[in-house]
Amino acid sequence: MNEIFKELEGDCMGENVQLKDVIFNDSKYSKTKKVLAIMFITFVFLLQVNGTDKMIGFIFVFTGTVIGVTYSVCKLLFYNTKRYIKDIVFLIIFVCLFVWGIITFFNL
């Protein structure tokens, strides 16, 4: 966890960092983004498995997966970076979570 804070301190102190580089560039904040993505996917999975309140669970799942799909599509299509297998896998995971959330919502 200390590595993540050191990474944040090192990049933010005294530099004017563009937001698009922070969001889409794999070298900036890569550990932080990976940890947050894994935590979110785990959180959404646990929300759906535990069967929380229907509306709260749907809002979390819908919001997060729409943001995840939008991020992945923008990164793959509009931002000039190398296309990696992991980016495509994350897009597939987010789409699957979204579809699973919709199916779960309408079946409850």
UniProtKB/Swiss-Prot annotation:
This is Uncharacterized protein BpOF4_21044. The keyword Transmembrane helix applies. It comes from Alkalihalophilus pseudofirmus (strain ATCC BAA-2126 / JCM 17055 / OF4) (Bacillus pseudofirmus). One of its GO terms (cellular component) is plasma membrane. The chain crosses the membrane at residues 36-56, 58-78, 88-108. It is found in: Cell membrane. Keywords: Cell membrane, Membrane, Plasmid, Transmembrane, Transmembrane helix. It is a multi-pass membrane protein. The keyword Transmembrane helix applies.
